[in-house]
């Protein structure tokens, strides 16, 4: 693992390539941005019942993961936790 590469910024070419991949994945899975936003809102509402989260830094996107049969769609969520709520 190259530690210097880990801390370096992505080039605009790499960012554009990653965005295009995400658009293609969303298109192939027939999930519109509106539906993805609805999923995001619903997930955050449920999670917020139990955990205090940082809504500003939430990142939810469609991706793909390699399965035995090939590539499968995946919903990837990065949700920063501030603290666990007590009942």
Swiss-Prot record:
Pfam families: MinE (PF03776). One of its GO terms (biological process) is regulation of division septum assembly. GO terms for cellular component: plasma membrane. Gene3D superfamilies: Cell division topological specificity factor MinE. Keywords: Cell cycle, Cell division. It comes from the Bacteria. InterPro entries: MinE, MinE_sf. Coiled coil: none annotated. SUPFAM superfamilies: Cell division protein MinE topological specificity domain. Belongs to the MinE family. Prevents the cell division inhibition by proteins MinC and MinD at internal division sites while permitting inhibition at polar sites. This ensures cell division at the proper site by restricting the formation of a division septum at the midpoint of the long axis of the cell. This is Cell division topological specificity factor. It comes from Clostridium botulinum (strain Hall / ATCC 3502 / NCTC 13319 / Type A). The lineage of its organism: Bacteria, Bacillati, Bacillota, Clostridia, Eubacteriales.
């Amino acid at each position: 693992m190259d530690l210097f590469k880990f801390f370096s910024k992505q080039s605009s070419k790499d960012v554009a390539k990653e965005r295009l991949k995400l658009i293609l994945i969303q298109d192939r899975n027939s999930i519109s941005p509106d539906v993805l936003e609805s999923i995001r809102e619903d997930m955050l509402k449920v999670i917020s019942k139990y955990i205090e989260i940082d809504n500003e830094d939430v990142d939810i996107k469609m991706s793909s993961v390699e399965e035995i049969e090939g590539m499968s769609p995946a919903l990837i969520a990065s949700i920063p936790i501030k603290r666990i709520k007590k009942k």
